[in-house]
């Protein structure tokens, strides 16, 4: 009997051709916020491949290059003759203009970066319901001098003659500003105008439709085979566990490797939650002593990560062999992971990796290449915010859905320098106080991450009538949308005072608390 072909996955309604923009991922997210499915693909994607996908609209992203430079990234110019609506953003607009016979040069007046009010010159489908003089986000050093035949100017700014252009007959549009950036006041209006009014997309990309399409597909893919999932307790692996449990039930086995670097009470919470409350089979692997022994005397942060990664691999291999055999490995790969695997490694039709490889455990290191698993990656086309919505629809509680991101190596990289039981206990208690007070203040869901860091130095203090010499704790709280950039959170002084007082009074070997007010960039969120 011939093997059944897997049901074809849905094609994107909007295809985003990436020219190296830092915002390409953000464009896709904004379109999905409008309940329209979008994918990012390489600018090398051919017209034939685009025709096979048959999107309702195409967006050409921005990029760091200038279109008149040698070796500037291009796309197949035949896309402009497909009759598919196209929106060029910044570099994408300039490329469209140049390819169709217009002229792009370095900005005559001056480059334009940051907020700029746009002046609307005429009515257009693209700028419908966008207020005149509204603020948009600019980031360009080139300008359009002459438009191709058939185009008109529909908007300008003080320094940019062509802030938005239109060729209504050919359904080609361009904006010099970035509508996807939150600083653009009516940016989402522009995106919706293109997606709905111009490209005629339907708002049919929802959590419900994702589940309706994905659960039968998982059942069909797995059949009666066994699936192994390395459970970390984060939102990605937890959502995946619930999704797979709903699809295949007892054919799923979760493996939770406790390496001893988790936050206070988390291993116990996870086992109680998954195994006992929701009856999802979890194999608990206590490898605490094994991991900490390997880190004895190690101070270099990269070496710590590598050691934890290697040991994770060894434990995973040993336990999967003991519990197996398994035919499938489930991974919480998300769409940003797929995008980062980049360009020629992506199938332009599906946005999936062509050469399937096992994803690196978050911040820890990859699993062995010779593990003979087939992959189950049902979240690979979702962004983090979409995963949270799926988790909520599947019944995951807020304790997991809204949990702050936590690095794979855990507290081992929040202890600067060498790691010991004493330092782990100290940091674990301090970190719990930080999160406890942030929650009591009603700030937890407004902050991307809030945690404690233990420094490898000691400071002088006075407690009672005695001189102390103990560790300082760093309080790190940041606000962010995606972790790519972050700003330090403005925590009320009263909350900071409570955190500091509790830590120095309740945590042994700590006599000082300092507050990190560094943004990313230049700093990173984690200290190691």
Swiss-Prot record:
Residues 13-204 form the Glutamine amidotransferase type-1 domain. The active site is at 90 (nucleophile), 178, 180. ATP binds at residues 232-238. Its EC number is 6.3.5.2. Pathway: Purine metabolism; GMP biosynthesis; GMP from XMP (L-Gln route): step 1/1. It catalyses: XMP + L-glutamine + ATP + H2O = GMP + L-glutamate + AMP + diphosphate + 2 H(+). Residues 205-403 form the GMPS ATP-PPase domain. GO terms for cellular component: cytosol. GO terms for molecular function: ATP binding; GMP synthase activity. Keywords: ATP-binding, Glutamine amidotransferase, GMP biosynthesis, Ligase, Nucleotide-binding, Purine biosynthesis. It holds the Pfam family GATase. The keyword Nucleotidyltransferase does not apply. SUPFAM superfamilies: Adenine nucleotide alpha hydrolases-like, Class I glutamine amidotransferase-like, GMP synthetase C-terminal dimerisation domain. Disulfide bonds: none annotated. PANTHER family: GMP SYNTHASE [GLUTAMINE-HYDROLYZING] (PTHR11922:SF2), GMP SYNTHASE-RELATED (PTHR11922). Catalyzes the synthesis of GMP from XMP. Homodimer. This is GMP synthase [glutamine-hydrolyzing]. It comes from Prochlorococcus marinus subsp. pastoris (strain CCMP1986 / NIES-2087 / MED4). The gene is guaA.
């Amino acid at each position: 009997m011939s093997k059944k072909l897997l049901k074809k996955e849905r094609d994107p309604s909007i295809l985003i051709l990436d020219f190296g923009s830092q915002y390409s991922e953000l464009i896709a997210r904004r379109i999905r916020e409008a309940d329209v499915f979008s994918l990012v693909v390489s600018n090398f994607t051919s017209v034939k491949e685009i025709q096979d996908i048959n999107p309702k609209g195409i967006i050409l992203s921005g990029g760091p290059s200038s279109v008149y430079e040698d070796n500037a990234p291009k796309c197949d110019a035949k896309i402009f003759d497909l009759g598919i609506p196209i929106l060029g953003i910044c570099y994408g607009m300039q490329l469209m203009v140049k390819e169709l016979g217009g002229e792009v040069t370095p900005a005559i007046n001056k480059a334009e970066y940051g907020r700029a009010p746009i002046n609307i010159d005429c009515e257009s489908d693209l700028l419908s319901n966008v207020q005149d003089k509204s603020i948009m986000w600019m980031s360009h050093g080139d300008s359009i001098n002459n438009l191709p035949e058939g185009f008109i100017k529909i908007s300008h700014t003080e320094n940019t003659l062509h802030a938005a252009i239109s060729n209504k007959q050919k359904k080609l549009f361009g904006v010099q500003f970035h509508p996807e950036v939150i600083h653009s006041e009516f940016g989402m209006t522009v995106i919706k105008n293109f997606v709905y009014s111009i490209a005629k997309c339907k708002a049919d990309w929802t959590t419900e439709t994702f589940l309706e399409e994905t659960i039968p597909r998982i059942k069909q893919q797995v059949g009666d085979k066994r699936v192994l999932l390395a459970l970390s307790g984060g939102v990605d692996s937890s959502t995946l566990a619930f999704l797979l449990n709903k699809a295949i039930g007892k054919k799923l086995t979760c493996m939770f490797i406790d390496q001893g670097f988790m936050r206070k009470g988390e291993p116990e919470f996870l086992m109680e939650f998954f195994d006992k409350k929701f009856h999802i089979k979890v194999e608990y692997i206590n490898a605490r002593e094994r991991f900490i022994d390997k880190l004895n005397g190690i101070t270099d942060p990269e070496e710590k990560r590598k050691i934890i990664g290697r040991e994770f691999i060894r434990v995973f291999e040993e336990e999967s062999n003991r519990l197996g055999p398994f035919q499938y490995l489930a991974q919480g790969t998300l769409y940003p992971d797929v995008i980062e695997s980049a360009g020629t490694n992506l199938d332009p039709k599906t946005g999936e990796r062509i050469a399937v490889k096992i994803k690196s455990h978050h911040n820890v290191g990859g699993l062995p290449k010779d593990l003979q698993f087939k992959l189950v990656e049902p979240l690979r086309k979702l962004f983090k915010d979409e995963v949270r919505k799926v988790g909520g629809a599947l019944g995951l509680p807020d304790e997991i859905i809204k949990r702050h991101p936590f690095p794979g190596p855990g507290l081992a990289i929040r202890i600067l320098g060498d790691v010991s039981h004493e330092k782990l206990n100290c940091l674990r208690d301090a970190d719990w106080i930080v999160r406890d007070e942030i929650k009591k203040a009603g700030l937890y869901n407004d902050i991307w991450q809030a945690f404690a860091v233990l420094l490898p130095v000691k400071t002088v203090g006075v407690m009672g009538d005695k001189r102390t010499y103990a560790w300082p704790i760093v309080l790190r709280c940041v606000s962010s949308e995606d972790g790519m950039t972050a700003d330090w959170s403005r925590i009320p002084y009263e909350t900071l005072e409570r955190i500091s007082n509790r830590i120095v009074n309740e945590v042994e070997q700590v006599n000082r608390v300092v507050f990190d007010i560094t943004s990313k960039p230049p700093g990173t969120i984690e200290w190691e």
